[in-house]
């Protein structure tokens, strides 16, 4: 997960990180690398991901998945407009990449819906959850679309918490 974060406070002193990870800006005008308003930051960020995924000769020519927080956590709990996620969904569908949503900080009803991504009306291919689901217990999970989950052989992903009394 450290390869995915852009937070220097989490990366400093660790590494080397997994290769093949390309970062794109989150649509928050306050920290956006391009001079733009909040409304256009969401559109520009979505179009930039589409460009990375669907334009030949970019560094992202063989992307397996786009992983995104449905609500920016560490940057100030910023909810992007639904348009951003709709653009990501369309870009992933066009390129064949999976759209995986990180709901570790924002899921489990913390935004008024079970999952924050529901506010955008977008269905992800995968969803990561934790923190709020565990009620302060060490719980996390990953949910996939049923057609994708069926492709994973039984017991190919063992449970590393299996020996913990709380996990029984």
Question: What are these model-derived regions, one by one?
Answer:
Residues 1-168:
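Conserved N-terminal phosphate-binding loop of PLP-dependent enzymes in the Aspartate aminotransferase
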